[in-house]
């Protein structure tokens, strides 16, 4: 069985775009692969964080992923900072990565140009090696990523090839070269207010996204005010009708009906009826998730699952870390 690793940033409540584009697929992947889902809190502190809020977001995100259907019997879900091998591996990887490689990373270039090099943390430059460590520690064969993160996977692959070539003995590879697993087509959900840009939880216009924890009345209001067009005809056309096309994608993901079935069902009907029904479909989708989320937050079950997840993750990560330490010559002697 192949292994999948995915890191999840604890940076606010996911949107239905995150659910449709990633979380929903994770639930399916756990049935076919050996999955590790890691809440990457060490990555979060590359920018300033309020400690209490960060801890709250870590538990909240873990509860939400379990509430949508991640099964701790099938997948390992854990907190990055609770497995110290991540930081140790990150240092070994930094020492085998050039400054030039890191300065070419898009996120560092964008933020350092925006804020000036003196205004960003060193962690923003060096976090890609930590991300490489996240992946290689679990011998990941596949990493699900969006188009915006393919660059990090290329860095990971380049590093692993270089590390194995430099340190492997008798052609025995030390680390596994991961493959990119691109999300399925059609899973990109757009803003409700600007349907040509991706839905984002950091959107300053809160009407542009639906949070996984939005109340039913809020969901109905946001969908009612979603931007469409003046024709009133429900059809799928990304170029000319991006608004209604986006709503059709959401409706399809929420109900399991195909876009074609939905277009046929609403033939001759207006946007008002369509939006009202879509809102109820989204409410029905999120309601059981929200109930389970609240149960987990209020119980000891969540912490028990995360404790066990960290323990299972350590068993695998520490073995890989020891291979890396042995390879580069750390410690007084080779350990197994």
Curated annotation (Swiss-Prot):
Motif range for 'HIGH' region? 10-18
Q: Which residues cross the membrane?
A: none
Which residues participate in ATP binding? Answer: 9-11, 17-18, 146-148, 189, 198-202
Annotated residues that bind L-tryptophan are located at 134
Alphabetical list of PROSITE patterns matching this protein: AA_TRNA_LIGASE_I (PS00178)
One GO biological process term: tryptophanyl-tRNA aminoacylation
Q: Where is this motif: 'KMSKS' region?
A: 198-202
Q: Where in the cell is it found?
A: Cytoplasm
The protein's job, in short, is: Catalyzes the attachment of tryptophan to tRNA(Trp).
* Name listed for the protein in its UniProt record: Tryptophan--tRNA ligase
Look up and give the organism this protein is from: Enterococcus faecalis (strain ATCC 700802 / V583)
Q: Taxonomically, what lineage is the organism?
A: Bacteria, Bacillati, Bacillota, Bacilli, Lactobacillales
């Amino acid at each position: 069985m192949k292994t999948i690793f995915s890191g999840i940033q604890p940076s606010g409540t996911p949107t239905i775009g995150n659910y449709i584009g990633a979380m929903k697929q994770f639930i399916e992947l756990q049935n076919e692969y050996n999955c590790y889902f890691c809440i990457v809190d060490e990555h979060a502190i590359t920018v300033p964080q309020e400690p209490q809020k960060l801890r709250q977001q870590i538990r909240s995100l873990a509860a939400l992923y379990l509430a949508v259907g991640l099964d701790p019997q099938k997948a390992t879900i854990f907190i990055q900072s609770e497995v110290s091998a991540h930081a140790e591996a990150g240092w070994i990887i930094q020492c085998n990565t050039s400054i030039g490689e890191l300065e070419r990373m898009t996120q560092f270039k964008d933020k350092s140009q925006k804020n000036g090099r003196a205004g960003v943390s060193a962690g923003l430059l060096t976090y890609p090696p930590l991300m490489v460590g996240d992946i290689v520690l679990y011998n990941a064969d596949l990493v699900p990523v969006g188009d915006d993160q393919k660059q990090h996977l290329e860095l990971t692959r380049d590093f692993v090839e270089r590390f194995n070539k430099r340190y492997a003995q008798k052609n025995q590879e030390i680390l596994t070269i991961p493959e990119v697993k691109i999300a399925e087509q059609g899973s990109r959900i757009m803003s409700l207010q600007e349907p040509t840009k991706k839905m984002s939880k950091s959107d300053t216009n809160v009407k542009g996204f639906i949070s996984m924890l939005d109340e039913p009345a809020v969901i109905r209001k946001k969908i009612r005010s979603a931007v469409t067009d003046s024709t009133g005809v429900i059809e799928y056309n990304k170029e000319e009708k991006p608004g209604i096309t986006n709503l059709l994608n959401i409706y399809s993901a929420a109900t399991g009906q195909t876009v074609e079935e939905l277009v046929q069902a609403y033939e001759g009907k207006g946007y008002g009826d369509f939006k009202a029904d879509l809102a109820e479909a989204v409410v029905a989708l999120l309601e059981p998730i929200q109930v389970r989320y609240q149960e987990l937050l209020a119980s000891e079950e969540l912490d028990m699952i995360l404790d066990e997840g960290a323990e299972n993750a350590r068993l695998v990560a520490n073995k890989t870390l020891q291979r890396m330490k042995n390879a580069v010559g750390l410690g007084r002697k080779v350990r197994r």
